């Protein structure tokens, strides 16, 4: 017998929530095979068995919070003996039948119940789903899942709701996973549990707001030259780099690296009474997912070319949306860039990420009239950029200079190529 324990994840992560059991009691388990998915403050991770055998016991249920080092399952040798559970179920059913009225205990009804019990045993469902179904008298054969092979507790709960609600409210409940409260039917509301990650994000954002002297400075960038360069080079870039597209994010990433080298205070953090200035350039790129905004890091951007940065950004975005990010993708960055422009934002004051000193905000490119010299006004594609920074570390002079460096490099992309 071997216990499966929650592994060490990251220095800042001490616990997680069991999001989903991937194996049921009685399933064969290979060495190194994942048996459950754990939701942490940063990413979802799979917990694997270090031994081959049969999953003989689940020590926690879906939704339970478990700590690092805590045993969550037992993997044994050979086949699991489920006769005790089966006999207990059988005896409970027999006791229930003895208490039923004569009308309910006719042979045909009993035969029907036995058939239903056998049918439920053949259906692939999690232990929590079976317990909930037995407790509430739900026939698992009438429960439809969410597109996978295993019925789960929420599938059973949704099936219960569907029997008492209209088709419209059923669809709404299944899509949102929430519970509607109707104390005042004319003012309906929906109450739902926040996910662990959203609760953590809310806590961290509040901590940043309360524990830093955050200030934001703005500038504007004429995107004419970089857009022209991208237009001229994008087809050749795709051919030269196996289909990788040239976007604006790589330009801003390289510009940020150059500005960080010029203004190292922006690449720092406070640790107690010390200020730590980072000598590396791991740039976080904010990615929007169904679970909210995630910030994986592109490592060593000072050593990567434009194509390598674009490829890594694309790979991290796919991993984020497929919930495949690892903890190594999410920790120990030095600076973050967020692009609210993809959602149509014209201007914003982004919030600093974690222990970093600053964050760069990109926004929508909007064509508007600009005075290009004393006597000439032209329509130019313009972008507002913002730098939110911790005023305890960074003075206004450095913040303005940093943003001005970004502006100059983007407006003169040939200089940016030379910087690289």
Curated annotation (Swiss-Prot):
Pathway stated in the Swiss-Prot or TrEMBL entry: Amino-acid degradation; L-lysine degradation via saccharopine pathway; glutaryl-CoA from L-lysine: step 6/6
Active site positions: 391, 395
Residue spans of biased composition, Low complexity class: 159-174
Any GO MF annotation of the entry: dihydrolipoyllysine-residue succinyltransferase activity
Keyword set includes Metal-binding: no
Pfam families named among the record's database cross-references: 2-oxoacid_dh, Biotin_lipoyl, E3_binding
Catalytic activity: N(6)-[(R)-dihydrolipoyl]-L-lysyl-[protein] + succinyl-CoA = N(6)-[(R)-S(8)-succinyldihydrolipoyl]-L-lysyl-[protein] + CoA
Job description of the protein: E2 component of the 2-oxoglutarate dehydrogenase (OGDH) complex which catalyzes the second step in the conversion of 2-oxoglutarate to succinyl-CoA and CO(2).
Record-given protein name: Dihydrolipoyllysine-residue succinyltransferase component of 2-oxoglutarate dehydrogenase complex
Species, as recorded: Staphylococcus epidermidis (strain ATCC 35984 / DSM 28319 / BCRC 17069 / CCUG 31568 / BM 3577 / RP62A)
Phylogenetic placement of the source organism: Bacteria, Bacillati, Bacillota, Bacilli, Bacillales
